[in-house]
A protein has these predicted regions:
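Short, aromatic-rich membrane-interface segments at the entry and exit
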Residues: 40-49, 108-113, 164-171
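Alpha-helical transmembrane segments and their helix-entry boundary regions
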Residues: 82, 134, 148-149, 187-191
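"…centered on the first transmembrane helix and the immediately adjacent amphipathic helix/loop
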Residues: 52-55, 59-112
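Functionally important transmembrane alpha-helices
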Residues: 33-35, 167-223
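N-terminal, membrane-interfacial amphipathic/helix-forming hydrophobic leader that caps
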Residues: 1-68, 202-225
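Residue-level signature of the transmembrane alpha-helical core
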Residues: 48-51, 87, 91, 117, ...
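Aromatic-anchored segments of alpha-helical transmembrane domains
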Residues: 26-35, 91-100, 153-162, 196-206
Length: 225
């Protein structure tokens, strides 16, 4: 191998390592909060520290790569097409969840439902951005689209562990949102799908299947096995 080819190969590997390290650091910051900080009485500043640092890293990474908000999927571009592609699986999943709720007589409004619903739009958009606008885009730099989609969905499910029903639901949702984002990247459309599905899960899934939406170590503290 010639010197230029060796240098090019080394640069490629370094770039891949940087992309992978960025994804791992963001995922670890989320897991740190879920497993080491959130279950215990810590200050708000300490609790928000890792996510804030992760957000700064993501924004800096976008700046270094000259990625714009429009490029990431914030904006009107592809919105109609993405929403159309997501409509089928989203409505099908909603119908299935409501059917399960009807059959099991579990349709209900949980405590603080409307308050939680008011917070959901911003929360699901942040999740979609972290999952697709950042993690998927970084993995996509050195992986085949299908590989990147599956791994991204797996990471999204991982941060919802050990809540098994949520792990399954988020993995399936991550696959659908990832496939659509690969074709027509629009975060607002995927956030709408995420919002509708989350609201349906809250009112339709039986409590004996999904007793709460808690994740991480707090889930183990609040649920006996």
């Amino acid at each position: 191998m010639s010197a230029p080819e060796s240098s090019s190969s080394s640069n490629t590997l370094s770039w891949q390592a940087i992309n992978l390290a960025e994804v791992i650091s963001v995922v670890l910051s989320i897991l740190l909060v879920e497993w080491a900080l959130a279950p215990f009485a810590v200050s708000v500043w300490l609790l928000g520290g890792p996510p804030l640092l992760a957000l700064v890293l993501m924004l800096y990474s976008h700046r270094c790569r000259r990625e714009t908000a429009q490029t990431l999927g914030f904006g009107g571009r592809y919105f109609d097409r993405a929403l159309l592609l997501l409509a089928g699986p989203t409505l099908l999943a909603i119908a299935a969840l409501i059917f399960v709720g009807y059959v099991t007589h579990s349709l209900h409004l949980p405590d603080r439902f409307w308050a939680r619903l008011c917070l959901l739009p911003g929360w699901v958009l942040l999740q979609q951005y972290t999952m697709l606008g950042f993690s998927y885009r970084r993995l996509r730099q050195f992986l085949h689209p299908y590989q990147a989609i599956i791994i991204t969905a797996g990471l999204f499910a991982l941060v919802h562990a050990p809540n098994v029903p949520l792990v399954i639901l988020t993995f399936l949702g991550g696959l659908i949102w990832g496939f659509v984002y690969e074709r027509v990247p629009n975060l607002f459309a995927s956030a709408i799908s995420h919002l509708l599905l989350s609201a349906t899960v809250l009112v339709a899934v039986p409590e004996w299947v999904l007793p709460s939406m808690t994740v991480g170590y707090r889930y183990l503290l609040y649920h006996s096995f």
